[in-house]
Amino acid sequence: MGRTYRTIGINLKAMPLGESDRLLSVFSRDRGLLKLVAPHSRGSRSRLGGRVDLFVVNDLFISPGRNLDRILQAETVATYQGLHHQLTTLTAAQYLGEVVLYQIHPQQPQPELFDWFCATLDQLQGASSRAALAILVRGLCGILRLGGIAPEWYQCHESGCKIAVPTADTDWRLGFSFAGGGVFRIRADHPVGNESVAGAGGDRQLTASEVRLGQWLAMPTTQFLARDEFLTQAEAYPLSVWLSLERVLRQYLQFHLEQPLRVPPLLDSCFSPVAVSQP
């Protein structure tokens, strides 16, 4: 066992361990994924208290162990309490946290992903349901970008030709390939599914509005817009389009992860059919 060490980390997952401990999955900015024992953290008199709660950022002092390292001391840096004001913002945060947990690994620092995730959680605080959805989708796009698997929106992944999107919604459709990692022109000999995943490649159709939104989110200027300016510009796209693009990204993520995500179905219950039909 080595010396104690210090790191900044955010709690992504917690589970009971033994009679009184918790096992935390912590995303450390400079160490990647850490599995840490939070000793005696399940008791009412725990000195760690709320420091082991979900999405709390702590300055941690850690003692290396033979199998698992142990938290000696934790000083809270951020808590994101505004996530708990409504179900949609909390669900969006849990959605992002689940995806991030799949992207991180022990001893592999990802400071850009850490900063992006924390910034997105901060933007979600106090957001309306519609705003939370837009922030979530932008957050997912950033995670995909930092993971090196961002979809291609501006050119056909098969031919390399640039995509010209109509300014108004028509019967125009574009294909989206999960295996190919982006959009493609639909051919008569290449049938594409609509809402459901079709074929081994997981292809589906996108409308002009969905492609325009994907292209807008892929722009570097959009990725780093301040929260209020981003939400103002996001109003140009109907709620139904945001919901549709979220499902595309969800399926795309699940295709690459080769397993279903647990949290996203909870997001569906946050939006009633009546709300989805409104712009």
UniProtKB/Swiss-Prot annotation:
Alphabetically, which GO biological process terms does the record hold?
Answer: DNA recombination; double-strand break repair
Which of UniProt's keywords are assigned here? DNA damage, DNA recombination, DNA repair
Please verify whether the record's keywords include Protein biosynthesis: no
Provide the Gene Ontology terms for cellular component. bacterial nucleoid
Gene3D superfamilies membership = Nucleic acid-binding proteins (2.40.50.140), Recombination protein O, C-terminal domain (1.20.1440.120)
Which InterPro entries does this entry report, sorted A to Z?
A: ARFGAP/RecO (IPR037278), DNA_rep/recomb_RecO_N (IPR022572), NA-bd_OB-fold (IPR012340), RecO (IPR003717), RecO_C (IPR042242)
What the record says about family reads:
Belongs to the RecO family.
Protein role? Involved in DNA repair and RecF pathway recombination.
**PANTHER family recorded for this chain?**
DNA REPAIR PROTEIN RECO
How is this protein named in the record? Answer: DNA repair protein RecO
Q: What gene codes for this chain?
A: recO
